[in-house]
Amino acid sequence: MGITSVLTKDNVKKIDTDIDVQERDLNVFITSASRVIAPLWPISTFAARNPWMGLENQPFDQVASWLKNTRDVDIYPSASMIRSAKNKGEIDEDFVEMGLQRWLDSHSYHIPRDVAERFCHAALKLDPLPSDLLSSHELEKLVSECSGLDHIENVFMQPLSSYIENQDGERLVNILDHHVIKWSKLYLDDSQAGWTMPNREEGFYRAWQHLIQYDPALSKKQRERVKGWPKEAHLALQEALFALEIPESEIQTYLEGHLLSLPGWAGMMLWRSQQSSHEHALLTEYLAVRISMEWALIKPYLPLTNERSKKTISIAPLIAAWIHWGGLTLEEWSQMTASEQNEYLSFAYSFDEKLRKKLWLEAWEQTYTDRLSQKIISKQRETGREKSALAQLAFCIDVRSEPFRRQLEKEGPFETIGIAGFFGVPIATCELGSKHSHASLPIIQKPQNKIKEFADEDVFKKYNQRKQAIHSLSHTFKTMKQNALSSLLLPELSGPWLTLQMAARSFVPRKAGRFIRNLREAWLRKPDTKLSLHHDATEAEIPVGFTDEEKVNYARQALKMMGLTENIAPLVVICGHGSQSTNNPYSAALDCGACGGAAGGFNARVLAALCNLSEVREALLAEGIKIPEDTVFAAAEHNTTVDELHWLYVPELSEAAQEAFEQIEAVMPKVRHHVNAERLAQLPNFQSKLKNPKAEANRFAEDWSEIRPEWGLARNAAFIIGKRELTQDCDLEGRAFLHNYDWKQDESGELLANIIVGPGTVAQWINLQYYASTVAPHYYGSGNKATQTVTAGLGVMQGNASDLLAGLPWQSVMESDHEAYHSPLRLLILIQAPREYVERLLNHDSAFLQKVQNGWVRLASLDPEGCWESW
């Protein structure tokens, strides 16, 4: 046996073996511990998740220190990222200096200011200390003569298995992880495996308990250790904690350590527990399985020495830092008094790598903020320049909409609007012939209504038969592939067709993809459909359709959010957005985050149809919102991969609306060409001068070997809430979420509050997902797409036994193996409104205030006089 950490009495209170852990109610401990992970939903509906959503009650830098101490995870940008940003001119070093001076002013050290500044300036270059200095005998001698720091770091309680190695030198926690991954995959499988886990209906813990006695990966003695274990998960967890002698005061921290060992699988268990009352205790069951397995594995090594050391600070790097960065000689150091040495050591310890990276990150963020403010303020439009729009097009706030909107406005008398892509209709959508519905709204909300597609009975019956034929063929193929006997015959039966498909997909992907898609559409011949907008009295968990009051409420709310309560154009187009890619497990990550990881076209159709209802218009007119008689609402979907606008719902148009429609159609090829060229030029190794942008965009969408069909929301950095005139003349480089807002129409502040709670939260989650996947890809990302394995129908792993990877793949944030494309900046929220509006928002929304104060988002405002203020 090997102990990988020295255990001392000083770190942990003496274990009181009289504590009867079995009598403790673990619910509070588990609920509190679960804050260190975030729910993880299936990849088929991939929506952004903030990995630190449960930790926002703590400052960002404290969480950074905690993660570094507990998991050795650094959530600040690496030195190489910072150098690259500096070399590209993305960081103004004046802001680094300002941050340094503020830090020096706020700390009191008995060190000359010029000496401290010289040390800090050299250390901020982020160069590593020379290895020959660290290993020198002279330094070793100085260390032996030094009394050291009067400071000891805390060590957080880790799983006991992390301290033990087996005879082969492998840590037992790694073996434990392997077992837990295996059982988690079996239980959570979503119809991918041919055989389901026996006794699954009894719950995770009970199913595991039935099968563990037959696990060949465990020895007979290990299986016997849990043979008589309690049949209830919470009792088993209590039993395991008691057997491991975990002190009551350390239980929560101990559970946190186990949850953080496999945050992906634990996050999926947490999400499942929140979705179903049947699985409400699933996280408890997960911990019961994991810690019971730990007990079975480490029993022969117990009891461990009742000592776990505090992590004492190594002073060698601190002395070396003063010699290398501070310019001190070995002789000068040896001549210092003990108190002087302690003062210098304390200073070097405080100005550690984390603080240095923090100063660089804040300077990076301030540089972006400063340049954005200059760009916006310098290009403010003069009053009265606005012309009446022939058409108004409402797009999702998604950063990919910004270049498309900018180019569209250049080509004609069009006004574009930004709004969350579910358009304020909290619905579950059910497509024609489907038995399943999708919650097409932000993950943080629950659907209030279900809207179904339907068609005439005779037409639908024939369509459904054609659809079932395709489904049956696909199901038969999958069944044969998973069956032990029929899988031997499958290559002979399917080989010719699959060979032809593989060759076509590989050598002519664009033509092959178009041919297969056209063939499928020609066979299905999906009929024209209608939507179940009207309330169905049939009782259901979620009501089908809307009541008359709901129709008016949702239409009114959306129009106010878009600022369309007056001066409404003849044609208003509600534009959802989606993406197009082939052989891409992360396709949902490229769709609309505000629609729960699906395309937003369905929601666009619903809102457009509501706004065309005569009874809705009459009710709105009574409230002072007049929609002109010749105004028509239509719906379209913006394909962000090929930058194409696809019409979904175009009712009978008035003469003025028809003119607007034709003009949009006329300019769309030019818009698409320019946006494709702008977007594709940012992809690595793309030669824009040598290739047709439209053809190349289509190839990216159809090529099944393409690991980066588009950049998605990479480089997102700002969320701007204000009138379109604020940013209309600005090239925001596809980095800003844009939400329309007119403070003059929001006296109560309710609209602003709703934007922050809904779209603002979604944007922040997206931002932090990209941030985390960039700065800590090994822990919060999902690795290389080319080596990923889709598992259990839920997510991806690297290989066949890793954590369930929760973040974005390498190709979504990295330009190359050594160069990041995404700039890891925390989201800047800019509000165009008087100062008192922002003050009221912060006073009423304590959760948002907490995010701002703790550094999870940055906040700025622009008042009517054009004064920019950072909060």
Swiss-Prot record:
GO molecular function, one term: zinc ion binding
Names of the cofactor(s): Zn(2+)
Subcellular location field: Cell membrane
Binding of Zn(2+), residues: 396, 398, 577, 592
GO cellular component: plasma membrane
Protein's membrane topology: Peripheral membrane protein
Keyword field: Cell membrane, Membrane, Metal-binding, Transport, Zinc
InterPro entries recorded: DabA
Subunit details: Forms a complex with DabB.
Membership in a protein family: Belongs to the inorganic carbon transporter (TC 9.A.2) DabA family.
Function (record text): Part of an energy-coupled inorganic carbon pump.
Name assigned to this protein: Probable inorganic carbon transporter subunit DabA
Lineage: Bacteria, Bacillati, Bacillota, Bacilli, Bacillales
